[in-house]
UniProtKB/Swiss-Prot annotation:
This is tRNA-specific 2-thiouridylase MnmA. InterPro entries: MnmA-like, MnmA-like_C, MnmA-like_central, MnmA-like_central_sf, Rossmann-like_a/b/a_fold. The lineage of its organism: Bacteria, Pseudomonadati, Pseudomonadota, Alphaproteobacteria, Hyphomicrobiales. The active site is at residues 112, 208. It is an enzyme of class 2 (transferase). It is found in: Cytoplasm. It catalyses: S-sulfanyl-L-cysteinyl-[protein] + uridine(34) in tRNA + AH2 + ATP = 2-thiouridine(34) in tRNA + L-cysteinyl-[protein] + A + AMP + diphosphate + H(+).
Length: 391
């Protein structure tokens, strides 16, 4: 086996590297080329429309494509640019806008990895005769029986496992993540040593197609009627003010709600059907149960074979939060997670990612998107009563 756990010498192994034009994927290409692998760099043109293409740090914009091309020239490897803009719009941007309109808070990076990078690009890599597709993600994979399993990376500050939970077993077996055992400073030092022009380049932003971070601008551009005004309502039923569209709000938000109140109020619910923003005290945010959809289970046995009383593991509901104790249940076609410690600011559309434990080298067991969450009994009763009140 070679360094990528593939049979044969590096010189007889073709690897496609997904090159975004950033330092991470550039170093992956450089390391593999230095080992003697036949490296083919592929850059995806995902978004080249309006102001976003001029945004500093936006992924796969014009400058990034030029940077990837220069790195490939420096390394002496083949490089191709593929126009995936239409696929990206249909698979990522349009669903992103639709989710906000329905009151959810989506994670477009998961959708991009799930559909474009690890589905379409992986198929392209196979068509090019590659033995593996390598990326610059900070996550580890290693052999686990007849397959490979995902693990959190050495650099906890760069851990991208939250955004990769939807990677299927078939994809994991074909993918390689050479940076999983490195820190970001090490990667930059290698880029400097190799003389790569991107050695000091800033990291790309998560949402590449949102100019200046104003996602509402993108949504209203794609869906002109999305910003429907409505009431800002207290969870107890009082109308406190008006808003210019639920797409401007997210669960757990406190600042910029647009009302004056004698107590701290948070967005606790987005009622898309009635165009209402529901606010309440912080305790109304506490969530204990998460009902999941589109679950991608990466355990060693089928999800249907979970014990009747569930499986204890750890769950992460935000990319910036550490995993916390939880119990996974699956019964009668439904999958849900019981959080042992309450979480606040849990929004539908976000991900709940599952881990073996809370250590830095924990195994990733997959996860799912949050369909809905259940609060404390008092908050659930108030929300249920509010839904029966006409707007």
């Amino acid at each position: 086996m070679n360094s990528l756990d593939l049979p044969g010498r590096p010189e007889a192994t073709r690897v496609v590297v997904a090159m975004s034009g950033g330092v991470d994927s550039s170093v992956v290409a450089g390391l593999l080329a230095r080992e003697g692998y036949e490296v083919v760099g592929v850059t995806l043109q995902l978004y080249d429309h309006g102001a976003a293409v001029h945004r500093a740090g936006s992924c796969c914009a014009g400058q990034d494509i030029d940077d990837a091309r220069r790195v490939a020239e420096t390394l002496g490897i083949a490089h191709y640019v593929l126009d995936y803009e239409e696929r990206f719009r249909k698979a990522v941007i349009d669903p992103f806008a639709e989710s906000y309109v329905t009151g959810e808070t989506p994670i477009p990076c998961v959708a991009c990895n799930q559909t474009v990078k690890f589905s379409d690009l992986l198929e392209t890599a196979r068509e090019l005769g590659a033995d593996a597709l390598a990326t610059g993600h900070y996550i580890r994979s290693r052999a686990n029986g007849a397959h490979r399993a995902l693990y959190r990376p050495v650099d906890a500050d760069r851990d991208q496992s939250y955004f990769l939970f939807a990677t299927t077993q078939e994809q994991i077996d074909y993918l390689r993540f050479p940076l999983g055992g490195m820190s970001k400073p090490q990667v930059r030092a290698i880029a400097e040593e190799m003389g790569l022009s991107v050695a000091a380049k800033h990291d790309s932003q998560d949402i590449c197609f949102v100019p200046r971070g104003k996602y509402s601008d993108v949504i209203t551009k794609l869906k002109p009627g999305a910003a429907s005004p409505g009431d800002i309502v207290h969870i107890d039923g009082r109308v406190l003010g008006r808003h210019e569209g639920i797409l401007h709000y997210t669960i757990g938000q406190r600042r910029g709600i647009g009302i004056a109140a004698g107590e701290p109020l948070y967005v606790v619910h987005l009622d898309a059907e009635h165009a209402r923003v529901v606010v309440g005290p912080r305790e109304a945010l506490e969530t204990r149960r998460l009902i999941l959809r589109q679950v991608n289970w990466l355990g060693d046995f089928p999800l249907e074979e979970l014990p009747a009383n569930g499986m204890d593991l750890f769950a992460k509901v935000r990319s910036t939060r550490p995993p916390t104790p939880a119990t996974l249940h699956n019964r009668d076609g439904s999958t849900w997670v019981e959080l042992h410690e309450g979480e606040t600011g849990v929004a539908p559309g976000q991900a709940c990612v599952l881990y073996s434990d809370d250590r830095n080298d924990a195994r990733v067991f997959g996860g799912g998107f949050i369909e809905r969450s259940e609060r404390c009994a008092d908050a659930e009763a108030l929300l249920s009563r509010l839904e029966k009140i006409p707007a």
